[in-house]
Amino acid sequence: MPSAAYVAGLIDGDGCITAFLKRLKTSPHGFAVKGRVKITSRSLRLLEAVHRDFGGQIVDRGDGLFDLCWESFEEIERLLRTILPFLIEKREQALCMLKLCSLRRSRAFHKKVEFVRRIQELNSGASTGRGVKRA
């Protein structure tokens, strides 16, 4: 049984916490806010063990890799609240995602978009200097 600290390490190392806007004609704004937490691994056995205790959906990518994904804001919030004390590299993304989760029933679309952009900025490394080559 993987611990919350172990799962946090997987997400810090081989995972992703992201948010994005998806076109949705039925939405008043023309977009829906979506979130995703994902761990990628060659080990299906590992992801099945994490899935048993932490939920999510396993996807066979067909290239020898598997993804374990959490995509509903309820699942994402439950997962991140459990592993947050142990996250290091993706802690800021997790905190922003938790704020986004708390807004899931809000009509403040502009506020949701702010958090989507912040998460994307953190993932690009623009705010931390990661991804920038140093001499």
Task: Indicate where each model-derived feature is located.
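Internal intein/HINT superfamily modules and their associated LAGLIDADG
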Residues: M1-A135
